[in-house]
From Swiss-Prot:
Deletion consequences: Deficient mice are viable, fertile, and have no clear phenotypic differences from wild-type mice.
UniProt key word DNA-binding: no
Tissue distribution of the protein: Expressed in sperm (at protein level). Expressed from almost all the cell types of testis, with abundant expression in round and elongated spermatids (at protein level). Predominantly expressed in tissues containing motile cilia.
Name this polypeptide is given: Sperm acrosome-associated protein 9
Function: Microtubule inner protein (MIP) part of the dynein-decorated doublet microtubules (DMTs) of multiciliated respiratory cells and the distal singlet microtubules of monoflagellated spermatozoa. Forms an extensive interaction network cross-linking the lumen of axonemal doublet microtubules.
């Protein structure tokens, strides 16, 4: 359990750095959308961010922030697998884990996803268009982190026998 908590802390630290560069992230997505002639659709999946990065990103600063986003998403996905291996779960932890796995799935539609208080990521977006186009993608990481913290909190309340069962 300590190992997953440490992994989560590490991801949270990377996310804090990413969060400080949210305007750069939005600018990178905006330029990629312009290069792709795709200004109508919102950013709707991790897969779309990956495609923009690979095919339409021609600026090293923008590429760096898009890579940072992709790396955090990849680490969250790996942590989901680690959670799954830790114990067989309860209905509550299984539900939280399924939500996390769905959210970090490459093709999951993020367009309607919005982080709520205390997360201010959507509020930091400049206008309605930005909120409509980027609200889901900027909400993804804080929502998944919240679900993971909740998973850990529920898992820590389980009897040791249940936790050990998952590792045998």
């Amino acid at each position: 359990m300590n190992e997953v908590k440490e992994s989560l802390r590490s991801i949270e630290q990377k996310y804090k750095l990413f969060q400080q560069q949210q305007f750069t992230f939005i600018a990178a997505l905006e330029h990629c959308r312009e290069n792709a002639h795709d200004k109508i659709r919102p950013i709707s999946s991790i897969e779309q961010v990956q495609s923009y990065m690979e095919h339409y990103c021609n600026n090293s600063t923008h590429r760096r922030i898009l890579i940072m986003f992709m790396d955090i998403c990849s680490e969250l996905s790996k942590l989901c697998q680690h959670f799954e291996a830790l114990h067989s779960g309860t209905p509550v932890t299984n539900s939280l884990l399924e939500k996390c796995k769905t959210l970090v799935s490459q093709s999951n539609d993020l367009s309607s996803l919005r982080a709520k208080y205390p997360h201010e990521v959507v509020n930091h977006l400049s206008c309605d268009e930005a909120r409509n186009h980027y609200g889901g993608v900027v909400s993804l990481i804080p929502i998944v982190l919240d679900f993971m913290k909740e998973w850990i909190a529920h898992s820590e309340k389980l009897p040791r026998k249940v936790l050990q069962h998952g590792t045998t």
